Swiss-Prot record:
HAMAP family: Nucleosid_hydro_RihC. This is Non-specific ribonucleoside hydrolase RihC. Its EC number is 3.2.-.-. The active site is at H233. It comes from Escherichia coli O6:H1 (strain CFT073 / ATCC 700928 / UPEC). GO terms for molecular function: purine nucleosidase activity; uridine nucleosidase activity. GO terms for cellular component: cytosol.
Amino acid sequence: MRLPIFLDTDPGIDDAVAIAAAIFAPELDLQLMTTVAGNVSVEKTTRNALQLLHFWNAEIPLAQGAAVPLVRAPRDAASVHGESGMAGYDFVEHNRQPLGIPAFLAIRDALMRAPEPVTLVAIGPLTNIALLLSQCPECKPYIRRLVIMGGSAGRGNCTPNAEFNIAADPEAAACVFRSGIEIVMCGLDVTNQAILTPDYLATLPELNRTGKMLHALFSHYRSGSMQSGLRMHDLCAIAWLVRPELFTLKPCFVAVETQGEFTSGTTVVDIDGCLGKPANVQVALDLDVKGFQQWVAEVLALAL
């Protein structure tokens, strides 16, 4: 039986690969997409997500979400993904539109209609998920688990200790981590290992039209290089759903720093139990890189 999932995203070049995997992995049933401001503005992430759905002729409803973090000013990652968020490929025009309600309400409504609890996957800042949990707490029993790409047990990628998705809205992340729902965190500890090699990248233009599109996007992606390999951060959250055996997880207490002058946005991962607090997150700490690369090749070969 396919696993029903809702995907919250901020496309983003590596988001595009994750969306492809969510659509084409035969084990998954992507039922709803929502967008959030992150890599670029929410208007741009929504446009990019709709372009991808049109590219794949995927009839998946999409709702636009939060334009700004809960408390602080927005930050983006246009230096990594380009000003549009998906620089490098010219998508054809379409007339698709997002749903007429905010993302967190679209998630609420879909959860309440679902015949069984649904897995949420969040590969951008956690603003929409925090709004859902704070404004609609009645939804918690209908969430099977939340799988996120975000955080780190060690170093960061936008500050010395903070990963971008958490640092973009630390207050939202803190709300989510305190919520009591089951959380799997695929952070930089594994995503920095999730590298597609130059040899594989060179094969993409001949793979299928998805491969051609991704190859064009990758030429503008600044998380690695076409010559040294590219890190597929967001794809790890999808990979865990399908191939959890590729990941080494440890239950840990995780809190999000929201006040520190130099540490705001840091995920404080208590690997050794120093704080004596119960674990609230399953933290991915290691990755079978070869197995991950093989799975990516398999799932992208299934794309249109």
